[in-house]
Amino acid sequence: MSEQYSNDFKLNAAMAAIVLSGGVIGYAKSKSMPSLIAGSVFGLLYSTSAYYLSQGNSKVGLGVSVLASSLLGGVMGKKAIATSKPIPIILATGSAFTLLSSGKELYNIHKN
């Protein structure tokens, strides 16, 4: 793995774990299938991003990260504004940070 993208790898692996565990916890607490499905889908996207980054395919890894972060940020941002609950706020903030980090690196790749 390129040392240049190791922070993006760690960030995407952490987001995968957070989102997947959040979906499982949401299902366990309230039998929420949407939480389980969304947590699984976004966890898989972030895991895919981390995998490609670990294999040195930074364009694909960062692209998947930007996609996942954009979608999750939009959904959770809307929910955070509507409910002011902490979990949507945390997920919206985490996805925004991941989007900025991965987006900046992807921009730098395409700029050069």
Curated annotation (Swiss-Prot):
Coiled coil: none annotated. Belongs to the TMEM14 family. This is Transmembrane protein 14 homolog. Keywords: Membrane, Transmembrane, Transmembrane helix. InterPro entries: TMEM14, TMEM14_sf. The chain crosses the membrane at residues 9-26, 36-53, 60-77, 87-109. GO terms for cellular component: mitochondrial membrane. Signal peptide: none annotated.
